[in-house]
């Protein structure tokens, strides 16, 4: 790594990815269900992808544990010109 790349500001995507990796590592050590954050992240991304086009590395999920309660925080960076997907038409059964 050169001095120039060290001084260059990092993008939010790489910072978010690094934070998520730290959270995942922490969860694996602390929790009996190491896949909880991974599962939640994938399910949340799949639901969001049905409605809006968003880059996967722009989603940050944080799980904080307190006394008797856990808090799940989700930060999603939407571009200004986000593409909203139209709702799919569903066929209803005629009764």
From Swiss-Prot:
This is Cell division topological specificity factor. Prevents the cell division inhibition by proteins MinC and MinD at internal division sites while permitting inhibition at polar sites. This ensures cell division at the proper site by restricting the formation of a division septum at the midpoint of the long axis of the cell. One of its GO terms (biological process) is regulation of division septum assembly. Belongs to the MinE family. The keyword Signal does not apply. Keywords: Cell cycle, Cell division. It comes from Methylorubrum extorquens (strain PA1). HAMAP family: MinE. Coiled coil: none annotated.
């Amino acid at each position: 790594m050169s001095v120039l790349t060290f001084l260059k500001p990092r993008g939010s995507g790489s910072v978010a990815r690094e934070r998520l990796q730290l959270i995942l590592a922490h969860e694996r050590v602390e929790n009996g269900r190491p896949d909880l954050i991974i599962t939640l992240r994938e399910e949340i991304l799949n639901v969001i992808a049905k409605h809006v086009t968003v880059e996967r590395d722009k989603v940050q999920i944080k799980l904080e544990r307190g006394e008797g309660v856990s808090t799940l925080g989700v930060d999603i960076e939407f571009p200004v010109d986000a593409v909203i997907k139209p709702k799919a038409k569903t066929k209803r059964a005629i009764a």
